[in-house]
Amino acid sequence: MMRVPTFALTPPSGDELHDILRHSRSAVASYLLEPDESHQANACLYICNNRSYCLENLSVAGRRDARRAGRSLRIEFVDWPTVMAHGFTAFSETRTRVGLPDGTVEQFQSRFHQFSLNPFHCAVGAWQDDSLVAFMTLVVVDDWVEIEGSFSADNSRTSCPNDGLAHFVLSHFLIKRRFNTVSYGLSSIQDAQQTIGLHSYKKKVGFDAKPVHRAFVLHPLLRPFANPLILRGARMVTKMLPQNRMIKKASGVLVTLLENSPTSLMS
């Protein structure tokens, strides 16, 4: 269970953590802190607070790709029935590209049905003619936004739909609506090559990569299992089942708890 908003950096109390783990079904609670001598940076928080955001502030590649999307695609807010009717291809092909096996109709319907029930959740879509070739899912509360997910079809990637969606979201919320913060989440705890590509993409479209310390607190019943032997076993299973997201996440949590390894993105 990750604290929301993700970008909150104040330390929670011990009582708060105890109550969350006791009353939820979560095996682990996670939150962010400012790095210090006791909490070294081990993750990146992707965040934009620039209320003067514009294309001219981006790199040459960032401007080029956002403009390409603007010429090729129609980008707008989309309602949930539209996502459910037209978004499966973008979702499924994205999950396959990142090596995950859950790009199924059942997972798509379950995920976005549940997500759509919260009135603070919405979506932005990119259309190419009558095809929804990409969409972003958002959490919008008070004066902040978190990008929860981003999905695009394989045959649309030359049009840079994700760049166009990011530009739309930053322009709409920071400039038009004068929000304070747009967050694009955290670097992954999973040992995956895609992490480097995502890091470069998020910086290209206008987000700062803020070094943070990501802390994990295991449920008391699981703490005896956080040991080097279990970590070694988790790494072996990850090699045998590289598409198993749960095992990859568990391995990442154990690495952070036992080795406190700074993320390679810090270098």
Q: Where do the PLM segments sit?
A:
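Active-site/acyl-donor-binding loops of N-acyltransferases
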Residues: 34-55, 182-267
